[in-house]
Amino acid sequence: MALSKSMHARNRYKDKPPDFAYLASKYPDFKQHIQINLNGRVSLNFKDPEAVRALTCTLLREDFGLSIDIPLERLIPTVPLRLNYIHWVEDLIGHQDSDKTTLRRGIDIGTGASCIYPLLGATLNGWYFLATEVDDMCFNYAKKNVEQNNLSDLIKVVKVPQKTLLMDALKEESEIVYDFCMCNPPFFANQLEAKGVNSRNSRRPPPSSVNTGGITEIMAEGGELEFVKRIIHDSLQLKKRLRWYSCMLGKKCSLAPLKEELRIQGVPKVTFTEFCQGRTMRWALAWSFYDDVTVPSPPSKRRKLEKPRKPITFVVLESVMKELSLKASSLGSETAEGIVVVTTWIEKILTDLKVQHKRIPCGREEVSLFLTAIENSWIHLRRKRRERVRQLREVPRAPEDVILALEERKSTPKELSSGQDVAHSPQESALCGLDVPGGEAAADGGHCLSQKLLCQEETPEATEDERDEERGGMEAMESCKGSSNGAQDGEASEKGDRLDGAAGRYLFKCLVNIKKEAGDAVVEMHWVEGQNRDLMNQLCTYVRNQILRLVAS
C-alpha cells in the first residue's frame, strides 16, 4: 500500500511525485534506466542499484541543484524520505517561525557517502553541519560531494574512530551549542537480520528496493536499539550542549523500549513521528533537556484505512411520487410534491417504527435526515407477518365440491328476517372460519378452505411485497442477530433489542439523503456507526417496500 499521502506536509513530493518521463527526457543518464510498458507507462526497476542511484542523483540535481557521486558499494539514500527528516527537524527547532537569518547548527552522526542530510539542510535552510563518518570510503565521497557543491563553509566532514557518536566528536568544539543532531543508525545486529531471515514477518511482501549499504552502514552491535541507547547515554552527559537529539528508526518495535529508556532516565521532553514514502515506513525519536522548546505533537493514531462504502439506495419514480402526493391529499394532509412528499412519508414510517430522526441542513433540492435506531422494530413486524402467512399456509384447502356448493349458495341467497337464527352447515362454517361443534367430523369429511386464498383476494399486493421484502433483506436477516431461526431465537432477539433501548444504547446511526435526479427521487442511506451494517440494509428494504405498499393500496 502506498504511503505517500502520509508524507510530511511540506515535502515537495507529497502531492507531486517525480515525473520519470520528464526526467528521462531531460537527463540521458537517467533515461537509460527507465522502462516503458505496452501501455506507455514509464517505470523504474528499484532492485537495480544503478537505477536507484541514477534516480537519487537526478532528483538532487533537478530539484535542489546538487551534484553528487555515490559508490554502488555504499548506501544509496532515497530523496523523499530524507526530505521528511529535514522537515521534521525544522519543526523541532521552530525554523518556520524563527528569524531565517539566525545560523542554525546541526550534527549528522554517520553522514554516509552521499552526505545527503547536510547537503539538503545547507541548501534549503543555510544550516551549518558537523558531519561525522567512520568509514574511509564514505568519508572521502562525502568530502568530495561537499566540495563540488561549494558548501565547505557550511559543512564540515570529520573522520572519527569506530563507535564514536557525540562525546568524542564534540571534544574540540566544547563552547558551541548545537540546535540538533540527526542520525540514521545501522538497523541490523547481524547478517540474518539484514537478510530478513529472523526479523521480517513472513506475511510481508519482500522489499521493493535493493539494499547497497556497507557493513558499518547497516549493521552494528545490538542493532539500532543499542546504537540509539548509546546516543541517549551520551546525551545524558552532554545535556544542554544540544537543544534537540534525534534518531531515525527502521523498526517500529524499537520505538517503545527507547521511549521507556528516556522515561527511566528522566528526560523531560520527548516526541516521535513517522516518515512515509512509497511502501516504506520509518520512525523518528527526539528528546531535549530544555524547558523552553516547543514539542511537536506526535502523529495521531490512524485507524486502518477502509475502502469507502457506497450508500444503500433505492429510487422512487416520478409516477410513484405523484401517487404518494394523491394519497396524502386523500388523507387530509397538505398537498406536497417531489422529494417533500417522499420525505414526509419516510418520516411517518420512521415514526411508526419508533426510529429517532431529525432533519439536518443540506444543499438545495435535497433533504437530509439523521437516524438513530434504538431497537429493531422493523424486523418484529416482518416476523409477525411471516408467522401469520405461515399459519395461513397450514390451513388445508377445501374440496372443490364444497367450493361449488358455496358459490351456488351465494348465487341464490335466501331472504332472512332480522330476528331469525341462521343455521350453518359444518362445511359452510369451516369456510367462514367459525368454531363449529363437531368440527372434527367435518374435518374428517373434507378439508377446510385456505384462508390465505381469501387474504390474497382482499389484498393481492401484500403477499407480493412480502416476498420482495424477504428477498431484499434475506442476506441481512441471515447475518444479523435479530434474524429469526425459530421461536426461541426470535424471543431472545426481542429481549436483547429491548435491553439495548432500555440501557440508552443504540443499534446504529445513519444519514438519509433524499434528492431529486431527472424527475425521480433517490433515497440514499449512509452508514455512520453502530453494531451491524446489515441492520441498516434491513431498514432500507422495509422503508422501500412500505412506500410501494402505499401506492398499491
Swiss-Prot record:
Residues 17-20, 199-211, 250-254, 277-283 are annotated as: RNA-binding. Its EC number is 2.1.1.348, 2.1.1.346. It comes from the Eukaryota. Coiled coil: none annotated. Disruption phenotype: Embryonic lethality: embryos develop until blastocyst stage but development is stopped around the time of implantation. Defects are caused by dysregulation of MAT2A mRNAs. Its main location: nucleus. This is RNA N(6)-adenosine-methyltransferase METTL16. InterPro entries: METTL16/PsiM (IPR017182), METTL16/RlmF (IPR010286), SAM-dependent_MTases_sf (IPR029063). Residues 458-468 have a biased composition (Acidic residues). The modification Phosphoserine is found at S329, S425, S429. It catalyses: adenosine in U6 snRNA + S-adenosyl-L-methionine = N(6)-methyladenosine in U6 snRNA + S-adenosyl-L-homocysteine + H(+); an adenosine in mRNA + S-adenosyl-L-methionine = an N(6)-methyladenosine in mRNA + S-adenosyl-L-homocysteine + H(+). S-adenosyl-L-methionine binds at R82, G110, S114, E133, T164, N184. Methyltransferase activity is autoinhibited by the K-loop region that blocks S-adenosyl-L-methionine-binding. Upon activation, K-loop changes conformation, allowing S-adenosyl-L-methionine-binding and subsequent methyltransferase activity. mRNA N6-adenosine-methyltransferase activity is inhibited by zinc. It is found in: Nucleus; Cytoplasm.
